[in-house]
């Protein structure tokens, strides 16, 4: 009799757990089916004065203050559902940006990523123009592999033997909507050839 009572209790507990689990799954599904009524997307566009070549020796040989800059670019705040109500809480406050590097030649060494603070507000449905954005500084240009291209260091990449290093730069902006949601652009990519 005790065994049957234990089995009945186990069935009751299992049934109750199954009911709670079913309710939880159905609740989650209902939540994920809702439409986003106020999301935004950041994008980078309209590059002007984008450098395609840079001489490390000419610009960095006699100074530690050398930079590669993009003349100007635009960060856009796109409303994902323009038919839904929107507000100033969808404005994005830009906090920082990051540039990462990837070799486009046979080499494997790359500069350290550049991470810098950046301030500005991109209004919902609007743009923010950024002028003279630094995409490489002394930390990238005066260390390997780009420092190999300085004439004082031989003027060629020690890894490949080439006088040119071709890099892809990937630029990402990070920010928050005024309502507190984290937002980032997809990486905007472009290439630069570095020589001695």
Region locations from a protein language model:
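Sec-dependent bacterial lipoprotein signal peptides
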Residues: 1-26
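Non-catalytic macromolecular-recognition regions in eukaryotic signaling proteins
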Residues: 28-196
């Amino acid at each position: 009799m005790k065994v049957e009572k234990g089995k009945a209790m186990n069935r009751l507990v299992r049934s109750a757990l199954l009911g709670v689990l079913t309710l939880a799954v159905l609740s989650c599904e209902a939540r994920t089916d809702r439409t986003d009524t106020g999301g935004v997307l950041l994008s980078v566009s309209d590059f002007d004065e984008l450098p395609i070549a840079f001489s490390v020796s000419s610009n960095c040989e006699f100074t530690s203050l050398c930079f590669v800059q993009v003349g100007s670019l635009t960060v856009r705040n796109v409303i994902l559902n323009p038919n839904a109500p929107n507000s100033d809480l969808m404005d994005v406050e830009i906090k920082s940006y990051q540039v990462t590097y990837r070799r486009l030649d046979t080499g494997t060494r790359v500069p350290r990523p550049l991470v810098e603070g950046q301030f500005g507000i991109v209004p919902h449905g609007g743009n923010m123009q950024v002028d003279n954005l630094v995409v490489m500084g002394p930390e990238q240009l005066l260390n390997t592999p780009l420092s190999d291209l300085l004439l004082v260091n031989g003027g060629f990449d020690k890894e490949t033997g080439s006088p040119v290093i071709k890099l892809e730069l990937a630029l990402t902006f990070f920010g928050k909507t005024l309502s507190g949601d984290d937002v980032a652009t997809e990486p905007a990519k472009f290439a630069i050839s570095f020589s001695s």
